[in-house]
């Protein structure tokens, strides 16, 4: 059983797919989304897709990386030090560009899966072991990936954001040549001009990962300059570290994990366009609302009388408005019940509409009642059911309160521990300590999956 399926889904294959099925899926999708084939309005989206499928194929085509991904998922890959290679380098290696003549080009159409793509004389495709095959020219500078935490209020209202990034910039002293003298470069002896070397890294018991990194001798250029000939400013690296302020708009309705691409704002390299800056948005938790797709879930605590006799209350929205909510008399609300308000949820990106504001009710019962109160209630509320067997045929037992604030344990693990282990019902005492969590019930409003919807229907 694999931990997650995202990489498989990017390529449209199943987790038990064969190596040939992986290659076929990557070949078809890489050609479809290659930047050279997508120059129209959807260029940015196609380029992001191209990078996603390349990252997925790089991992799944390597048996060691695939084994690690299946066991630990993408987070485990990150923790092991994995960084995706250039999508263009992977594409070039796969289709044989730079490996021994031939190459590839994009035509104007074609009726097959490859849409006019010409493979030419590619030679052998080979495996992913060495990424060799001679010097591969960069298509552009390196991309810079950045994760950014944004509040739910900002994702609701939208926000213009400015950040400072560190990036490589072409050295102005040597104009990116790495030397102040012409014609002094030679092929790097360490990487043989390929710009990359591979290092083995132990990431777990009996697990060795082969990590591709930029050559430490030539700093990923594929060329070597004698020490005495190197530019004094960049030390022969052709680029220096610089800072750049970038600005972008977080659109209303942006979701957790969504990526924003700032084209041409990434690292520079001589003779090629700059790379991109890719911002991944992470949603910070909110104390009042929980997001469920396009819906917002708000927990409202009601006293027992209000849940029966009706009530009015205020909800402060994420854009500083106030909603006067009228709960009509006769609409009896039970513990765990939900109601919703149309068009008061999260903005739906690209539209003027919003999702639903779902109100999940947590009913507050009185902590104690007098005999007089009980007598009055017994005249109004339905009578309790009488057991159908004789008391003399049963063992008579009483009830004791469970205290969730203590660490007392019985020989069977303690009532509180058992309650928390098995989930329990949403009892009043547990709610006071932890609060009602309605996240599992959002599916019926369009925010969750089939399992969540089934749970909601069973309430």
Swiss-Prot record:
GO terms for biological process: protein refolding; response to heat. It comes from the Eukaryota. This is DnaJ homolog subfamily A member 1 homolog. The modification Cysteine methyl ester is found at residue 456. HAMAP family: DnaJ. Zn(2+) 1 binds at residues 171, 174, 231, 234. Its main location: membrane. InterPro entries: DnaJ (IPR012724), DnaJ_C (IPR002939), DnaJ_domain (IPR001623), DnaJ_domain_CS (IPR018253), DNJA1/2-like (IPR044713), HSP40/DnaJ_pept-bd (IPR008971), HSP_DnaJ_Cys-rich_dom (IPR001305), HSP_DnaJ_Cys-rich_dom_sf (IPR036410). A zinc finger (CR-type) spans 158-243. It holds the Pfam family DnaJ_C. Residues 405-459 are annotated as: Disordered. Zn(2+) 2 binds at residues 188, 191, 215, 218. Co-chaperone for Hsp70 family members. Plays a role in protein transport into mitochondria and in the regulation of apoptosis via its role as co-chaperone. A lipid is attached at residue 456 (S-farnesyl cysteine). Residues 418-435 have a biased composition (Low complexity). It is found in: Membrane; Cytoplasm; Microsome; Mitochondrion. GO terms for molecular function: ATP binding; Hsp70 protein binding; protein-folding chaperone binding; unfolded protein binding; zinc ion binding. The lineage of its organism: Eukaryota, Amoebozoa, Evosea, Eumycetozoa, Dictyostelia. Residues 6-73 form the J domain. Transmembrane segments: none annotated. It comes from Dictyostelium discoideum (Social amoeba). GO terms for cellular component: cytoplasm; cytosol; endoplasmic reticulum; membrane; mitochondrion; nucleus; perinuclear region of cytoplasm.
